[in-house]
């Protein structure tokens, strides 16, 4: 697997969960002898929603809710077969979305 990189993008609603998962990936890759760059934090996407509390006639009474989506990216440089096998067997938390791209 000469001159190849593995790009791993993580996405989650909980920042502690995503940091723990990124740490597990980094530890697994380093244990197999690969070089890791990251985790690199990407911009957080914040979605806000405003809801009227009163059923009618009181426009000033509102509640605001927000959802934050945290993202991280990792690059594994010069992966070997052991690295790929270890990453495939790795169990991450249920709330983390993982996208893997081989370049």
From Swiss-Prot:
GO terms for molecular function: structural constituent of ribosome; tRNA binding. InterPro entries: Ribosomal_uS10, Ribosomal_uS10_CS, Ribosomal_uS10_dom, Ribosomal_uS10_dom_sf. SMART domains: Ribosomal_S10. One of its GO terms (biological process) is translation. Keywords: Ribonucleoprotein, Ribosomal protein. SUPFAM superfamilies: Ribosomal protein S10. The keyword Magnesium does not apply. PROSITE patterns: RIBOSOMAL_S10 (PS00361). GO terms for cellular component: ribonucleoprotein complex; ribosome. Gene3D superfamilies: Ribosomal protein S10 domain. Pfam families: Ribosomal_S10. The keyword Electron transport does not apply. Involved in the binding of tRNA to the ribosomes. Part of the 30S ribosomal subunit. Belongs to the universal ribosomal protein uS10 family. HAMAP family: Ribosomal_uS10. This is Small ribosomal subunit protein uS10. It comes from Xylella fastidiosa (strain Temecula1 / ATCC 700964). The gene is rpsJ.
């Amino acid at each position: 697997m000469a001159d190849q990189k593995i790009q791993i993008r993580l996405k989650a609603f909980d920042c502690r969960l995503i940091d723990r998962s990124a740490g597990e990936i980094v530890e697994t890759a380093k244990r197999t002898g690969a070089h890791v760059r990251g985790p690199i934090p990407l911009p957080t996407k914040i979605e806000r929603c405003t809801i009227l509390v009163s059923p009618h006639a009181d426009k000033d009474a509102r509640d605001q809710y927000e959802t934050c989506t945290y993202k991280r990216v990792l690059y594994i440089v010069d992966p070997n077969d052991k690295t790929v096998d270890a990453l495939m067997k790795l169990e991450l938390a249920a709330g983390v979305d993982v996208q893997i791209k081989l370049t």
